[in-house]
Amino acid sequence: MANIKSQQKRNRTNERARLRNKSVKSSLRTAVRSFRDAAHSGDKEKAAELLVSTNRKLDKAASKGVIHKNQAANKKSALARALNKLG
């Protein structure tokens, strides 16, 4: 346990950020998984609308600093390629 007051506050702040980031990453994984399930089943319309919402979540996570912007770009690119592969 930290003895310095500023470090104690920093620990509390970091814990709040960790929980918030964990929640955002979990919802990202769920969104990507649901898109991949739709793409794997061949439902192009559902996959297309899930791609839009997943891209929005990826962009928001990148802008908040939860994930790196290049990671978001790579995931968006891979998901778009998967959608285009459907036909």
Curated annotation (Swiss-Prot):
Listed GO MF terms: small ribosomal subunit rRNA binding; structural constituent of ribosome
Gene designation per UniProt: rpsT
HAMAP family named among the record's database cross-references: Ribosomal_bS20
Name of the protein in its database record: Small ribosomal subunit protein bS20
Region (Disordered): 1-28
A GO CC annotation given for this chain: cytosol
Presence of the UniProt keyword Cell cycle in the record: no
Function as written in the Swiss-Prot or TrEMBL entry: Binds directly to 16S ribosomal RNA.
Organism this protein belongs to: Mycobacterium marinum (strain ATCC BAA-535 / M)
NCBIfam families membership: S20 (TIGR00029)
GO biological process: translation
Pfam assignment, any one: Ribosomal_S20p
Keyword Ribonucleoprotein: yes
Coiled-coil zones: none
Keywords: Ribonucleoprotein, Ribosomal protein, RNA-binding, rRNA-binding
